């Protein structure tokens, strides 16, 4: 119920700005209190709302992170941040899949894009959704091993970035979520040793599947613009 209300309110805000959820919203962050219990309800409600906005497996979804989050009011079970751009056109947007590494999200019942690349006249922005240690069948890889999961997570992100002609070196900011604070030092050590130039922070926030010990989202920027489009 709360998820539906949040999306309906946001759709109204977009309408007032002459925008739509399908055409202009490029990224969402959904923060779920007690994600292990409440995430399925959020997934169901989002899917229902998306169906009313022509966001389906035949069209497209929105890059997103669904993660543990809390509000000062304990009766608020879900909050959402969003990013939308007015004046953007469909030709500027490309959705990223990396099918050799990951499956399509709707195959296991959720509705978000793995990544979205947006090309402007002078640059390209790449939004990578919350990405974990998953394979092309939608299964958890390296269950119980946070370091191997971190390695596979980075491999998946590299594959998504590659589709947008970007690399890890193009990442401007990244957030790494861990389920257990006991894993902080090991994950930090691994990232610092293997990816010393990565601009990141680590946050304690359980991922939407209990078996995923770590997840990362990021935003990359490259100079690969297209003069057909405005430099918004």
Per-region residue spans from a language model:
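N-terminal presequence-like segments and the immediate start of the first folded domain
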Residues: 1-173, 177-232
């Amino acid at each position: 119920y709360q998820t539906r209300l949040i999306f309906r309110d946001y759709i109204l805000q977009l309408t007032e700005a002459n925008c739509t959820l399908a055409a202009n919203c490029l990224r969402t962050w959904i923060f779920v209190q007690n994600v292990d219990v409440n995430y399925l309800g959020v997934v169901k409600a989002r899917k229902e709302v998306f169906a009313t906005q022509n966001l389906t497996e035949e069209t497209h979804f929105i890059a997103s992170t669904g993660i543990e989050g809390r509000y000062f009011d304990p009766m608020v079970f879900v909050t959402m941040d969003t990013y939308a751009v007015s004046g953007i056109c469909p030709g500027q947007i490309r959705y990223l899949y990396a099918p050799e590494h990951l499956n399509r999200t709707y195959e296991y019942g959720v509705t978000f894009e793995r990544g979205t690349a947006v090309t402007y006249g002078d640059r390209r922005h790449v939004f990578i959704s919350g990405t974990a240690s998953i394979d092309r069948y939608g299964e958890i890889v390296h269950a119980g091993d946070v370091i191997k999961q971190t390695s596979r997570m980075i491999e998946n992100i590299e594959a998504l970035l590659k589709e947008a002609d970007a690399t890890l070196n193009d990442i401007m900011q990244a957030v790494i979520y861990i389920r257990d604070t006991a894993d902080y030092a090991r994950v930090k050590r691994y990232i610092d040793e293997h990816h010393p130039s990565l601009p990141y922070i680590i946050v304690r926030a359980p991922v939407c599947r209990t078996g995923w010990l770590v997840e990362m989202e990021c935003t990359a920027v490259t100079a690969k613009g297209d003069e057909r489009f405005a430099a918004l």
